[in-house]
Regions:
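GHKL (Bergerat-fold) ATPase N-terminal catalytic module, capturing the glycine-rich phosphate-binding loop
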Residues: 1-187, 191, 199, 222, ...
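GHKL/Bergerat-fold ATPase module in large chromosome/replication-associated machines
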Residues: 114, 132-154, 174-179, 183-674
Length: 674
C-alpha cells in the first residue's frame, strides 16, 4: 500500500467534503479528464508524424453495471505509465493537464482544448465511490497498469491488462445513506440508471469536443413471420445500441453567418424550456487578452415568475465547453434579468472545484461587454422594428425602469432612451427623445401624469390644462414609473435644435443654414414635472395676475375652507392651471398623491412614520362654484362653506382615483344639494 503524497488523508477528506458542494459533478470532472487525455494524444499526433490516428475513432465511453454498482468512464487517449499514475493520481492537486498546457503553451492551437487546471477533479470520484480503480495503458507502451484506492489509507499500483492505449476509470458506488433526522439521505442509485447518466452528460458535458458514447436501451418491432395470419399483432423487442450522447460542437462557437435562425430558435427552446421563439438573438465572439463566445436571447414573452422573489437570473457559464455554472448572475445586471444565454471562456479564473467563479476583473469585463451588446441590440429593435420593441417593452419594460430607480438614477444614461411612455397628444407609446423632438421651442420641461389608467389620466383637469396650452403629457400607469422619474430628476435630450438668446443670433444661424451649413444643435437638460405637483409656471402674466388678485381678495374664504378641511390640506389657493373643472388637488414637495397610493398598497400598508403628500386644494376662480363660495363667505354662512369645502375636496379626490374618507357623508352631501 502506497501513501498519497502531501497531507493526503486530511487533504482528501477536505476534497470530498468541503471543496465540492454538488456530488453529481463527479461525472463532469472524470469526462473532462478523459477529454484531456484524448486531446493530448491528438496533440501528439499533430507534432509527431509517426503517431497515426483516425480522428473518427477518438471517443469517450460511459457505462454502468447496476448489480455490481459500478460506473466506468473509458477513453482511447494518451494513457498513463506507472510513473505517471504515481505522479498524477498519487499526488493530490498535481495537474498533469496543467503541466501539459504549460510545457506546450507556444505550440497549442485551436485543435487542442485542455480543460483541467488544478489536479483535483479526479478525486471528486470519492464523493460517490467507496472504491476507485484506474486501468491505463500509455500510447506506445505494451504494458498496462492498475491504480486502486478506497480514498482513505492510500493506493496501490500493479501491472494490468488493456487491449489498447487509453484509460478506464471504474467507480464502485457507495451504498445509499440512511435517512437523517430531517428525513433526507443521499441516494447513489440515481447514478446507476441510463437516464440519470445521460442527463448528467447532457447537462455538464454536452459540448465536450469528442463523442461521449453509451449503450442505450431501445425498442423495435420484430420481423413479421411469413406464416402470420390476418390476426397477427406486432411484437416488439428490446435491444441495446451504442449512441453518442453529447452534441459536441456548441452552436455559440459557430459563426453566426453559418447558423440559420431556426437552429438558434430550436437551441433556445430546447435549452431554456420555452415554447416560443426568442424575440432577439445576439451572438458575438470577443478576442484579445480575454477571449470568449457569447450567445444571448431576449425571450418572446416574460416568464410567469419574472417579478417574483424566487426568480433566478444569470447566463450559463462554460469553460472550454464544460458547464461551470447554470446561472451565473454576475454576468447580467438586474435590469437585464430576462436575458438568457451562454458565455464560454477558457480564460476565466475558476475556483478549485470549478463550481463557482473567483470574483475578478475578467468576469467584470465580460459582464460589461455583455451589457453593452444587449443595450445595442435593444436600441436596434427600438429603431428598426418598433412593433416588436413595444411588445418587448410590455413584457420587460418594468425591469428597465426599476434599473434606474434602484440605482438612484445612476443608470439613467444607459437606460432612459430604452423607456416608452404613452403620449396623451400622439396617442401612442413614445420615447423620451421623441417627446423632446416634438416639443415647442418654449417648452423647458417634460410633463407627465401618474395614475392607474390612461383613460382616467387623460380626463384629469390638470392634464387637460397642459394639453390645452399646446404641450404633450406622458401618462404613467405603472407603480415604478414616478419613482423612476424622481430618481432621474431630468432627461438630457441630445441633438436638439439650438435655442438662441436673441433675434440677431437666430437670424445669423438661419442665414448660415440657407448658405449650406448644418443646423446647430445642443443637448438640453429637461426637468421631469408632474402636472399635479408644484407650480408648472405655464400661466401667462395676465393669468398669474388674475390668480394673485383673486387670492388677495378672498383670503378670508381660503382661511375658512382650510379650517373646515383641517389637516387634509396644507392650504387652499386659486389655480392658474384649471380651465373647466371647479377644483383639483395638487401636491407640494417630493411625494405626489400617486406615490402615496403606491406606498400604501404595500403588503403591510403605509409604514409607520411614512411622510404624507402635502395636498393643496386649488380652485378655479372662473367657475360658478367659486362664485357661490364667495357669496357664502360674504353672507357669513359657515355651514355652507364647510359643506362646499368637503364636497370639492372629495370630488377632487375621486378625479385622482382616491375614494373619499367617508363615502356615505359624501353621498349625503350631494343629495342634500340636489
Amino acid at each position: 500500500m502506497r501513501q498519497f503524497k502531501t497531507e493526503s488523508k486530511k487533504l482528501l477528506d477536505l476534497m470530498i467534503n468541503s471543496i465540492y458542494t454538488n456530488k453529481e459533478i463527479f461525472l463532469r470532472e472524470l469526462i473532462s479528464n478523459a477529454s484531456d487525455a484524448v486531446d493530448k494524444l491528438n496533440f501528439k499526433s499533430l507534432q509527431d508524424s509517426s503517431v497515426k490516428l483516425d480522428q473518427g475513432d477518438l471517443a469517450i465511453r460511459v457505462s454502468f453495471d447496476k448489480d455490481a454498482r459500478t460506473i466506468t468512464i473509458s477513453d482511447n487517449g494518451i494513457g498513463m505509465t506507472a510513473e505517471e499514475l504515481e505522479r498524477n493520481l498519487g499526488t493530490i492537486a498535481h495537474s498533469g493537464s496543467e503541466e501539459f498546457k504549460t510545457e506546450n503553451a507556444e505550440q497549442q492551437g485551436s485543435d487542442v482544448d485542455i480543460i483541467g487546471q488544478f489536479g483535483v477533479g479526479f478525486y471528486s470520484a470519492f464523493m460517490v465511490a467507496s472504491h476507485v480503480k484506474v486501468v491505463s495503458r500509455a500510447y506506445g507502451e505494451d504494458a498496462a497498469h492498475v491504480w486502486e484506492s478506497d480514498g482513505l489509507e492510500g493506493y496501490t499500483i500493479e501491472d494490468g491488462e488493456r487491449a489498447e492505449h487509453g484509460t478506464d476509470v471504474i467507480l464502485t458506488l457507495r451504498e445509499n445513506e440512511k435517512l437523517d433526522a430531517e428525513g433526507e439521505a443521499e441516494t447513489y442509485d440515481r447514478f446507476l440508471t441510463e437516464w440519470g447518466l445521460k442527463s448528467l452528460i447532457q447537462q455538464y458535458s454536452n459540448y465536450v469536443r469528442y463523442p461521449i458514447q453509451m449503450m442505450v436501451s431501445k425498442s423495435r418491432q420484430k420481423p413479421k413471420p411469413e406464416d402470420a395470419g390476418d390476426d397477427y399483432k406486432p411484437e416488439y423487442e428490446d435491444y441495446q445500441e451504442l449512441e453518442t450522447i453529447n452534441s459536441m460542437t456548441p452552436i455559440w462557437k459557430k459563426r453566426s453567418s453559418d447558423v440559420e435562425k431556426k437552429d438558434y430558435d430550436e437551441f433556445y427552446k430546447s435549452t431554456f424550456h420555452d415554447f416560443d421563439d426568442p424575440a432577439r438573438t445576439i451572438s458575438f465572439h470577443a478576442e484579445g487578452t480575454l477571449e470568449y463566445d457569447a450567445l444571448l436571447f431576449v425571450p418572446g414573452r416574460a416568464p410567469f415568475d419574472l417579478y417574483s422573489k424566487d426568480y433566478e437570473k444569470g447566463l450559463s457559464l462554460y469553460s472550454s465547453n464544460v458547464l461551470i455554472m447554470e446561472k451565473c448572475d454576475d454576468l447580467l445586471p438586474d435590469y437585464y434579468n430576462f436575458v438568457r444565454g451562454v458565455v464560454d471562456s477558457a480564460d476565466v479564473t475558476l475556483n478549485i472545484s470549478r463550481e463557482t467563479l473567483q470574483q475578478n476583473r475578467q468576469l467584470k469585463a465580460i459582464a460589461k461587454r455583455v451589457e453593452k451588446k444587449i443595450t445595442a441590440d435593444l436600441e436596434d429593435m427600438r429603431d428598426n422594428d418598433r412593433e416588436a420593441y413595444e411588445k418587448f417593452f410590455e413584457n420587460f419594460g418594468r425591469g428597465l425602469k426599476y434599473g434606474i430607480y434602484s440605482s438612484y438614477g445612476m443608470k439613467a444614461d444607459e437606460l432612459a432612451d430604452l423607456l416608452l411612455f404613452w403620449s396623451a397628444k400622439e396617442q401612442k407609446m413614445i420615447t423620451l427623445a421623441e417627446y423632446a423632438k416634438g416639443m415647442p421651442e418654449d417648452q423647458k420641461a417634460i410633463y407627465y401624469a401618474a395614475g392607474d389608467s390612461r383613460e382616467r389620466l387623460a380626463k384629469m383637469p390638470v392634464v387637460k390644462g397642459v394639453i390645452d396650452r399646446g404641450y404633450d403629457v406622458l401618462l404613467l400607469t405603472q407603480d415604478v414609473d414616478e419613482f423612476t422619474f424622481q430618481a432621474m430628476r431630468e432627461y438630457v435630450a441630445a441633438d436638439m435644435p439650438k435655442i438662441y438668446e436673441d433675434d440677431a443670433a437666430r437670424e445669423a444661424a438661419e442665414k448660415a443654414v440657407a448658405d449650406g451649413a448644418e443646423p446647430e444643435v445642443e443637448d438640453r437638460h429637461l426637468e421631469l414635472k408632474n402636472v399635479a405637483t408644484g407650480d408648472l409656471d405655464l400661466a401667462t402674466d395676465d393669468e398669474k395676475k388674475e390668480a394673485e388678485d383673486a387670492t388677495k381678495e378672498n383670503e378670508d374664504l381660503f382661511s375658512a375652507m382650510k379650517e373646515a378641511l383641517g389637516d387634509k390640506v396644507e392650504k387652499v389657493a386659486v389655480s392658474a392651471r384649471l380651465t373647466d373643472a371647479p377644483a383639483c388637488i395638487t401636491t407640494e414637495g417630493p411625494l405626489s398623491l400617486e406615490m402615496e397610493k403606491v406606498l400604501q398598497k404595500g403588503p403591510e400598508g403605509a409604514p409607520d412614520g411614512m411622510p404624507k403628500s402635502q395636498r393643496v386644494l386649488e380652485l378655479n376662480a372662473k367657475h360658478p362654484v367659486f362664485a357661490k363660495l364667495v357669496a357664502a363667505q360674504k353672507a357669513g354662512d359657515a355651514d355652507k362653506i364647510k359643506q362646499y369645502s368637503g364636497l370639492l375636496y372629495d370630488q377632487a379626490l375621486l378625479v385622482e382615483g382616491i375614494l373619499p374618507e367617508d363615502p356615505v357623508a359624501f353621498a349625503a352631501a350631494v343629495c342634500d344639494l340636489m
